[in-house]
Amino acid sequence: MTVSENSVLETEVLVGGSAMPNERPGAMEPQSLSQMPEGFPRRSTVANGVRSKVSRRFFVVGGALLLSAFAIYEMGAVFSIGGITPLEYLMLVLFAINFCWIALAFCSGIAGFFMLLKKPKPNELEQTELHTRTAILMPTYNESPDRVFSAVSVMAEALSQTGHGHAFDWFILSDTTDPEIALLEEQAFLVLRQETHKHSRVYYRRRRKNVARKAGNVADFCRRWGSRYDHLLVLDADSLMESSTITGLAQRMQADPDAGLIQTIPSLINGTTLMARLQQFAARIYGPVIGTGLGWWVQKEGNFWGHNAIIRTEAFMGAAGLPNLKGKPPFGGHILSHDFVEAALIRRAGWSVVIAYDLPGSYEECPPSIVDLAVRDRRWCQGNLQHSRILPTKGLHWVSRLHLMTGIMAYLSSPFWLLLILTGLMLALQAHFIRPEYFTDQFSLFPTWPIMDSDRALRLFYITMGVLFGPKIFGVLLLLKDGNFARSVGGRIKAILSVIFEVILSALIAPIMMFIHCGAVMSILMGRDSGWSPQRRDDGSMPWLTLIYRHRWHMLAGVMLGYAAILDSLTLLAWMSPALIGLWLAVPISAWTGSIKIGEFFKRIGILATPEERNPAPICIRAQEARAAYQAHIEQPWTLAQVLKDPALMELHLAMVDKQPLRAAGTPIEPVEAIVHVKVHEAQCQQSALALFNRQEMALVLANPLMLRSLQKLPEQFVPEDLVSFC
């Protein structure tokens, strides 16, 4: 059968036409990190072009440096009264690193606070007609199909009602490796097509081989279909976006010829466990302060968080092709945290990267438990530490390098905080158990007194706590100032109680996460790869024995630190207790925060409520209703045996199989493919063949029309008359 005949057959088999549109191949070459590509940066076509205001940088970055310099000077003064010892020098260095990290967030928070006090500007582009084409991409990897396809259904329907639906095409780009989920995706796609084919163009493709994970998934789309579109709007499997936000992003991109990427700040929704609701509340109350401040000062040198953003296809394909790093994982191979790198490369090429902090209606979900957060952070940690290989890239803007550094510090800060705690503990134990050396080997008429300026130290502690909690304080002030905002979370009293509860619970969880991040960093430095595990998104509960195993080292660390503190004094133990209690109670805290029942209890009493929870947007309500409907549609999943037995089902399945060959002609066959070929060839019947396949082999068979046709020709079951003897 020719390609054109096959396309006609697909159109007849699938409602709404073929599973994917005709390909329009385009180049997306891996970018050089060691030299600036020819023709970069591009020249702007408008006056002033891609320029940012230096005054904003001076206020935030300069302010953070001045604040850090003051704090470091004060810390040095605390130790300098009697001369600084080696341990005190170490503590000073660790304090400097940690304080610089929180000072930048504090100064960004100040900027965000004052920006949020202003009235938002009206959207001048709201009525702009779209004459560009945008592909909305929903990558998925072993996710619940009911969640993914129902979300696309409601977003596509809402977008079609705006009058701009003609400017958008929807793509579900699957990297699913589980054969059962792959078949469920096909069932869900058929339902989606039935619902949307009259008003939207929705497509589906499952890659046969998920090279380079999500970045490779999107790159594969770009190389095969990207040239059909002006923009790419990238979502995640748990994303939702209001139609006004989708059209707003496209209108902004169309209006600014220098825009390479526009990133929204997603709100967290649909949290059911206590941990998820804690993250939702914190992100809603404090997140806008940091996000708005960041967007205000980075200006045209913003960042990309991997989803809920629109990208100019020309900029992405021409400047953001990711190279493989030399060596093996975790520091070599494919770039894991691709988003920061893609933003940096797009900016290097002369395009702007903007954070649209003023654009609401962008949503995502969060991990339901500490364990799920740890699994996600292990992967992110590896990707962010891998950015140490990207930092020397030729031609990067200094703000892009700062984004990479902050990503690295998001995880290295935990080992630095732990070292700071241990150094302080060692200083206390040294003063308690070791006799001071008043006269050193060098001649001096005056002794070296191991003393500190306690008043200055206490003052510096208060300053540090103010800087650390500053963004939270700004968020609370904005909440209390805005009566409508306060009412949307249950009123000012409930809001204050929620803030107090969030601070206490976050303080208990923080030391657990510190040790989790320390373990992740250590694992990466030892050369262990994170792999790619699908995320749990709803229930975070786990058996108690599993939690004891996962948190055993955290509890042991808490006991050891507590023992070391009590060797000095009960006062030191009391000072360290906020961190130690969380470690001692790691298992019950992990169990309770991952519980849906406890999450529902706090929801009933109105603690940790958010506006999106109390008064959800219509798109969120419709998504929940549609998900339940999709669950009902696919509650009886197809099996490969059914596909082989039913010719009509086989044709439906083949119409949704990716047409790209598993491997290029002349390239070596992979072991798993060779094994499947042998099993299919040797099989006496379909039943015996299916019994021989493992999940990986089953997924490969589903994606291979030739193997499926070969299996289809076999009898369904073995009968003695069909016995073939081999001599």
Swiss-Prot record:
Describe the family membership recorded for this protein in Swiss-Prot or TrEMBL: Belongs to the glycosyltransferase 2 family. OpgH subfamily.
Q: Which NCBIfam families match?
A: PRK05454.1-3, PRK05454.2-1, PRK05454.2-5
Q: EC?
A: 2.4.1.-
Keywords assigned by UniProt, alphabetized: Cell inner membrane, Cell membrane, Glycosyltransferase, Membrane, Transferase, Transmembrane, Transmembrane helix
List the GO biological process terms: glucan biosynthetic process
* Gene that encodes the chain: opgH
> What's the main place this protein lives?
membrane
- InterPro entries on file: Glucans_biosynth_gluTrFase_H, Glyco_trans_2-like, Glycosyltr_2/OpgH_subfam, Nucleotide-diphossugar_trans
Part of which pathway?
Glycan metabolism; osmoregulated periplasmic glucan (OPG) biosynthesis
Q: What HAMAP family is this protein classified in? A: MdoH_OpgH
Is-annotated flag, keyword Cell wall biogenesis/degradation?
no
* Assigned GO CC terms: plasma membrane
Protein's recorded name: Glucans biosynthesis glucosyltransferase H
Which chain regions cross the lipid bilayer? 58-78, 90-110, 278-298, 408-428, 460-480, 496-516, 572-592
EC class (word)? transferase
GO MF assignments: hexosyltransferase activity
Function comment: Involved in the biosynthesis of osmoregulated periplasmic glucans (OPGs).
Entry superkingdom: Bacteria
Report the locations given in the UniProt record: Cell inner membrane
Membrane topology qualifier: Multi-pass membrane protein
Which intervals of the chain are annotated as region Disordered?
Answer: 18-42
Which CDD domains does the entry link to?
Glucan_BSP_MdoH (cd04191)
